[in-house]
From Swiss-Prot:
Compartments, as annotated in UniProt: Cell inner membrane
Organism: Paracoccus denitrificans
Keywords: Cell inner membrane, Cell membrane, Kinase, Membrane, Methanol utilization, Phosphoprotein, Transferase, Transmembrane, Transmembrane helix, Two-component regulatory system
GO biological process: methanol metabolic process
Its EC number(s): 2.7.3.-
Chain segments annotated as transmembrane: 1-21, 101-121, 144-164
Classification via SUPFAM superfamilies: ATPase domain of HSP90 chaperone/DNA topoisomerase II/histidine kinase (SSF55874)
Entry keyword annotation includes Ion transport: no
Region listing for Disordered, in residue ranges: 390-409
One Pfam family linked to the record: HisKA_3
Xref: PANTHER family: NITRATE/NITRITE SENSOR PROTEIN NARX-RELATED, SIGNAL TRANSDUCTION HISTIDINE-PROTEIN KINASE_PHOSPHATASE UHPB
Topology of this chain in the membrane: Multi-pass membrane protein
Protein name (database record): Methanol utilization control sensor protein MoxY
Length: 446
């Protein structure tokens, strides 16, 4: 916009300067031509000094006649150079209608000639003939008083047109840019608005074609991700079942055998102390292996999954955290409307792992002393289950942007996208750290 104003103003000034130079040249040529004719007439018609005629009277009449012409002036001067008469038609001449600055700008160099008036042997005076551009400058000013406003109005119109075009183009570019910004945020269903201008229509068509291609690629990736999650969960369930069915009985048998051995050795009159220590160590290790196996099985697939409600599943998780981290207070709040509903086994498993990962992050990285897990619905969207984890830990630092997500958060994001859910990474508000998972119900794989 500033460039358009500068260019328009420069063009107006250049055109004005050209018009002024040409007008000044025309005034000079017009007045010099009139001066030459007047001077030639004076030289030819002034009576000779020895002809016996009234030279001064005829010179005065000639001066009055020439002074009445346009673009020239004539006056009679005494031998000392002082005027002997006023201008013959001075009372009929109005003051210059052009402003003083314009007259000074347009007035050419003074052109004049002095013709002696003689009556032999005396010099009676001088007849002064000079170019007078006053009338011509007034005419030029009359033209300029129309041309210059029109010129500057045309310049203003050009600036207004440039501003209008710039605003129009900027708005259309901003609409395309806004659509691209939403696409960059992941909303690939947004499309750039169509336009009647061919150039912008082609630009919008190209952006929309790219968005459609990316949307198709994302849908394919989501489908593959959903299949991968389903296959992964099936494999985890199979491994958990194998561990439970094969390793569990063997560990139980091992502990039973150790207990039987301890009972048999208890009746010996003189049993070695090393034997008691060895049997106790075997019993202790067998117990730890059994606990580790139970933990691994629960990590692969929660034991209550499919047999208890989502609220009971989260309650079992919170109880486990209370047992292993007594210094942290973990609280569970469940909305009664959600307590008996089930979004599906895969969704429940995703909610369970989201809650577990978020609570662990609050304990390990945030050093939280109070963690609250809430399960409710959104007021404006009752079809969504909202799982929110809030803690009083340090959380992510404000003003540093979103931190690089870990593997746990990446897994949550992948599951949420595959299940059509919405995951909100941790953020700070009122000195608390919040994170959410919004799961539709019933939930289906995309």
């Amino acid at each position: 916009m500033g460039l358009a104003c500068a260019v328009s103003l420069s063009l107006c000034l250049i055109v004005s300067a050209i018009l002024i130079v040409n007008a000044r040249q025309a005034v000079q040529e017009e007045t010099e031509s009139a001066f030459r004719l007047a001077h030639e007439a004076v030289v030819r018609r002034l009576p000779p000094s020895h002809g016996g005629r009234d030279t001064m009277t005829e010179a005065i009449g000639l001066a009055e006649e020439i002074d009445g012409l346009r673009h020239v002036s004539a006056r009679i001067l005494d031998p000392e150079g002082q005027p002997l008469q006023h201008r013959a038609h001075g009372q009929l001449r109005s003051e210059a209608s052009a402003p003083q600055w314009f007259s000074a700008l347009m007035t050419p160099p003074l052109v004049e000639a002095l013709v002696p008036i003689t009556h032999y042997p005396n010099v009676l005076g001088m007849l002064r003939v000079a170019a007078d551009p006053t009338d011509e400058i007034a005419e030029v000013w009359g033209d300029f008083s129309i041309i210059l406003p029109v010129l500057f109005l045309a310049g203003l119109a050009m600036v207004g047109l440039a501003f209008l075009m710039t605003t129009l183009l900027t708005r259309r570019l901003q609409s395309v840019q806004a659509a691209m910004a939403q696409m960059q945020d992941g909303r690939l269903s947004v499309r750039a608005p169509d336009d009647r201008l061919t150039e912008f229509a082609d630009l919008a068509a190209g952006v929309n074609a790219l968005a459609s291609h990316l949307q198709a690629e994302q849908a394919e990736n989501d489908l593959l991700q959903a299949r991968l999650i389903g296959s992964s969960e099936a494999e985890r369930s199979r491994i958990a079942l194998d561990l439970h069915d094969e390793m569990g009985p063997q560990l139980f048998a091992l502990r039973a055998a150790v207990s039987h051995a301890q009972a048999m050795t208890a009746d010996l009159p003189e049993r070695p102390a090393a034997l008691d220590e060895t049997l106790d160590a075997i019993a202790g290790h067998a117990l730890e292996v059994q606990r580790s196996a139970r933990t691994a099985i629960n990590d692969l697939r929660p034991m209550l999954l499919g047999e208890a409600s989502l609220a009971e599943l989260l309650a079992e998780l919170v109880t486990g955290f209370r047992d292993v981290a007594s210094e942290t207070r973990v609280v569970l709040d469940v909305d009664p409307e959600v307590e008996g509903s089930s979004p599906g086994e895969l969704a429940e498993l995703s909610i369970y792992r989201f809650a577990r990962e978020s609570v662990l992050n609050a304990m390990r990285h945030g050093r939280a002393t109070v963690v609250r897990v809430s399960l409710d619905t959104m007021p404006d969207e009752p079809g969504q289950i909202v799982v929110r984890v809030t803690d009083n830990g340090k959380g992510p630092q404000s003003g540093t942007g979103r931190p690089t997500p870990g593997f746990g958060q990446i897994g949550i994001e992948d599951r949420a996208r595959a299940l059509g859910a919405t995951y909100l990474p941790p953020w700070r508000d009122n000195r608390l750290t919040h994170t959410e998972l919004r799961m539709p119900r019933p939930c289906k794989l995309r």
